[in-house]
Structure formats: structure tokens, C-alpha cells
Amino acid sequence: KPLYFLLFALSPLAAAENIYAPGQAALKFNQWYIAQLDQNKPPVLNPDIMNDYVASGTIAAIKEMYSGDSNDKDMPDADMFIKAQDWDDDWNQITVLHSDFDAVCTNVYVAFGKKQDHVIADCLVEEQGKWKVRSATLIK
């Protein structure tokens, strides 16, 4: 009986960990991503280094977009993950605001900077037991 009680008592902790996993994954990804940009190493130019953070289908799409002559393709005006052409010095201060989910993904709302005036929603999916970014949408 004590073992059943212990398992029952610890089950909320496991559930809580699963609830927060997408937010933690989005936070880690954005911290890493901004650090790469600060070092002038845009990850989209070397997408294989994003395997720990970005969904495999998204990495394949990035490779396709950046293959060949960019003059033959429509290229995005803004970075596809931070949804901006440039970033402020304080964007390494990243805050997860909240999350919600739908049939497609878990959306994690992330704010950049002290004022939190740049907000994106990262669409995360679970891939081989890990939460990974599929796409990002500019919120404000």
C-alpha cells in the first residue's frame, strides 16, 4: 500500500512536468537562437545544428528554401523564428508568457527584451519524445 500511495502522490509532479515541457523547450530554443545570432551565426544558414530544437520537417523546409539560387525564390523579409529583421541588445531576456494547444501544436507565447514588446508564438510539436519548434508567428 505505501508504494501505491507514493506513486499516486508523485503522479501530479509528472503531469506538471509534461505541462511545462513545451514552454521550457521554447525558452531553451530562443535563448540558444538569440545567442547564435549575437555571435553572428544565423542557424538558418546551417540548419543541421538546430536538430535538438526544431522539427525535422521544418529543417527540411529551411534546407530547401536556402538551397540553390535565392534570386529564383521568394525569401522571407524577417528571420523565420524571431519574426524580425534585427533584434535589440536586451532580447537575450526571454520570457514565456503562456501557452495553449490545438490539434496542430502547442503554441508557446514568448516575449523578448525587458519591456517584452516583441512577442511571438512558437508552434511546438512532440517529435521522438522531445518538444521541437515547427514554426513561429509574430504576435506583436
Where are the regions that the model predicts?
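Hydrophobic h-region of N-terminal signal peptides that target proteins for export
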Residues: 7-16
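Soluble non-cytosolic domains of exported or imported proteins
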Residues: 19-24, 44, 114-118
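Sec-dependent signal peptide recognition
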Residues: 1-7
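Short, aromatic-enriched amphipathic alpha-helices that serve as compact interaction elements
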Residues: 20-38
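Surface-exposed, charged secondary-structure patches
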Residues: 17, 54-114
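Short beta-strand edge/turn micro-motifs at domain boundaries
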Residues: 117-140
